[in-house]
Design a protein with these regions (language model features):
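Catalytic core of non-heme Fe(II) oxygenases with the double-stranded beta-helix
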Residues: 3-79, 89, 106-118
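Ligand-binding loop in jelly-roll beta-barrel domains
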Residues: 85-99
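HATPase_c (GHKL) ATP-binding subdomain of two-component histidine kinases
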Residues: 102
Length: 120
């Protein structure tokens, strides 16, 4: 079973941003972009949780930046594991940026799960 645990709308005006965070203990999180990306708009990004622990060689080879920016497209839904660190950069536009975000929990059918364990 899939259960939407929370849903909320975010409105970003000039100077607004969202600090780096995750959505534990949920399983999946998502964001629906209500606007296309425009210049100076806040940008959704994923943050590499262990970036500061990487050696310079690994950073140069595989992770040149600690953040991966996702271009917003109106109507696009982005799903990701809730443990992934993410945020929104500072919004520097006079045009409002809008999103709808949500958390999802996956609920196992405990009765069927127990039956499968007894097969061994």
């Amino acid at each position: 079973n899939i259960r939407v645990h929370e849903i909320w709308r975010s409105t970003y005006k000039r100077g607004c941003f969202q600090e780096i965070h995750d959505h534990l203990p949920h399983h999946l999180s998502g964001v629906l972009f209500l606007d296309d990306h425009e210049e100076n708009c806040g940008r959704f990004y994923f943050h590499h949780r262990h970036y500061s622990e990487l050696t310079q060689e690994w950073k140069e080879l595989y992770f040149p930046q600690s953040r991966m920016y996702i271009p917003a497209k109106r109507g696009q839904v982005l799903l990701f594991p809730s443990h992934m660190m993410h945020g929104v950069s500072v919004h520097r536009s006079d045009k409002v940026r809008r999103t709808v975000a949500f958390n999802i929990n996956l609920e196992l059918n405990k009765q069927n799960h127990s039956k499968n364990e007894n097969l061994s």
